[in-house]
């Protein structure tokens, strides 16, 4: 599995990033992990997700969930699910209004293309400062690719 890589995708807008991978598993298996906040730390490629601290076991449209995080310093963040299409797409955002999305495209019964995207193109003020201060935009594409490789390992393992 160490030679497996996700594809970092070109993006058209500043403060956005995207990566894609093909996983040999049904979309439902992958989506179940994405919709479970308690599972997020298992496939986080950034090392910033510590654990889920509040929210439902399984996400749904409008659900809120809290995560313990660490980027330079420990903090907690509350996320809200803003898009949810079972086994196809899930998107959440938090106070700074950038979004994390996962889109799943089943290409065969046991083969799914997963695209992870980050969109901070519409943020301003403190949120822009935070992204610059943490270096997130420099690191996000690589971290997203690592997350997708970890997600693939879990789903195919």
Where are these regions (language model features)?
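Beta-strand/loop substructures that line and gate deep hydrophobic ligand-binding cavities in soluble
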Residues: 93-146, 151
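A short, structured loop/turn motif at beta-sheet edges
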Residues: 24-28, 57, 83-87, 103-113
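Hydrophobic ligand-binding cavity/cleft-lining segments
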Residues: 1-55
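Hydrophobic pocket/interface hotspot
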Residues: 29-34, 40, 65-67, 81, ...
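Short, highly charged C-terminal tails/helix-capping segments
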Residues: 50, 150-157
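Intrinsic-disorder/low-complexity, polar/charged segments enriched in Ser/Thr/Lys/Arg/Asp/Glu/Gln
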Residues: 16-22, 64, 76, 89, ...
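Beta-strand elements of well-folded, non-transmembrane domains
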Residues: 25, 71-73, 120-122
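Short beta-edge strand/loop motif at the mouth of beta-sheet-based domains
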Residues: 18, 38-77, 84-87
């Amino acid at each position: 599995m160490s030679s497996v890589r996700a594809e970092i995708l070109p993006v058209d807008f500043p403060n956005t990033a995207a990566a894609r991978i093909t996983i040999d598993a049904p979309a439902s298996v992958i989506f179940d992990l994405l919709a479970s906040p308690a599972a997020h730390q298992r496939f986080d490629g950034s090392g910033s997700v510590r654990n889920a601290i509040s929210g439902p076991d399984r996400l749904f449209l409008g659900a809120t969930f809290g995560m313990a995080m660490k980027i330079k310093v420990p903090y907690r963040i509350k996320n809200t699910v803003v898009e949810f299409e079972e086994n196809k797409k899930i998107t959440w955002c938090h106070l700074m209004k950038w979004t994390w999305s996962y889109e799943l495209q089943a290409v065969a019964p046991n083969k799914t293309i997963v695209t992870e995207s980050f969109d901070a193109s519409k943020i301003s003020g403190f949120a822009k400062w935070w992204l610059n201060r943490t270096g997130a935009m420099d690191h996000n594409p690589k971290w997203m690719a690592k997350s997708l490789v970890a997600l693939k390992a879990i789903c195919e393992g």
